[in-house]
Amino acid sequence: MVGGGMPRGDPLVVGRVIGDVVDPFVRRVSLRVGYASRDVANGCELRPSAIADPPRVEVGGPDMRTFYTLVMVDPDAPSPSDPSLREYLHWLVTDIPATTGVSFGTEVVCYESPRPVLGIHRLVFLLFQQLGRQTVYAPGWRQNFSTRDFAELYNLGLPVAAVYFNCQRESGTGGRRM
């Protein structure tokens, strides 16, 4: 077991989401994320062309009086071997009522499609339970975002759910054309 009761074999532990992005936590809410016809499963690989548009996100929870914040980050920007921009914020949605999806929330930072250039990047969705509706301000920039600092600033505590996928540059793109 890793601190917080997460088994060492948990995909979030194996994929180093626990440690690089957040501390160990207990899953308490269902979180489903999907692009087009494919659901995101921990560690799956999706191509940049498949994630150009925002995903559909379904949040569980007890009832619609409970609100959640969704954060999407890339802890491997600009490259896994030199993550000097860790974390890169791709999306931030707040005030999502339980049992609904992100379309019912407030988009604080609009979705930016990941476009990894070097290496395999982890794209992480983290769901936090809010104490109530709250005003959240967009950070001044997307790079060097800290999920831990953000959660502390807005008194969100540890995540209640998370899922991640891997993404790398598609072969055959960006080359010279004759």
Curated annotation (Swiss-Prot):
Origin superkingdom: Eukaryota
Induction: Follows a circadian rhythm expression with a maximum transient peak four hours before dawn in long-day (LD) conditions, but barely expressed in short-day (SD) conditions. Targeted for mRNA cleavage by Pooideae-specific microRNAs miR5200a and miR5200b in leaves in short days, but not in long days.
Tissues expressed in: Expressed in leaves but not in shoot apex.
CDD domains: PEBP_euk (cd00866)
Signal peptide (residue range): none
GO terms of biological process kind: regulation of photoperiodism, flowering
A matching Pfam family: PBP
PANTHER family in alphabetical order: PHOSPHATIDYLETHANOLAMINE-BINDING PROTEIN (PTHR11362), PROTEIN FLOWERING LOCUS T 1 (PTHR11362:SF113)
Entry similarity comment: Belongs to the phosphatidylethanolamine-binding protein family.
Biological role stated in the UniProt entry: Involved in the regulation of vernalization and of flowering time.
Protein name per the record: Protein FLOWERING LOCUS T 1
